[in-house]
Amino acid sequence: MTKLEDHLEGIINIFHQYSVRLGHYDTLIKRELKQLITKELPNTLKNTKDQGTIDKIFQNLDANQDEQVSFKEFVVLVTDVLITAHDNIHKE
């Protein structure tokens, strides 16, 4: 497996590590998303312990408003984080 493929599989594995805990095994409920963000992105996203911030992120990701974040919806967060990280690298 290439380095990029390994990283892509890692993103999938992290999603599943949190999605299987409660509710549907392949979606994140708000509590699971909060745990994922708090533990996996503490240095990337600001105010991750603030419930209002989590609520806003969840609402923005939950495109179909079913109170769950699918992997497809989660990838929007990953994309935003990657774009921000890329932009920050070019600022240095």
Curated annotation (Swiss-Prot):
Keyword flag Iron: no
Additional detail: In the absence of zinc binds one calcium ion per molecule, in the presence of zinc binds two calcium ions per molecule.
Function according to Swiss-Prot or TrEMBL: S100A12 is a calcium-, zinc- and copper-binding protein which plays a prominent role in the regulation of inflammatory processes and immune response. Its pro-inflammatory activity involves recruitment of leukocytes, promotion of cytokine and chemokine production, and regulation of leukocyte adhesion and migration. Acts as an alarmin or a danger associated molecular pattern (DAMP) molecule and stimulates innate immune cells via binding to receptor for advanced glycation endproducts (AGER).
Listed name of the protein: Protein S100-A12
Domain EF-hand: 13-48, 49-84
Domain remark text: The hinge domain contributes significantly to its chemotactic properties.
Binding-site list for Ca(2+) 2: D62, N64, D66, Q68, E73
Superkingdom in the source lineage: Eukaryota
Chief place of localization: secreted
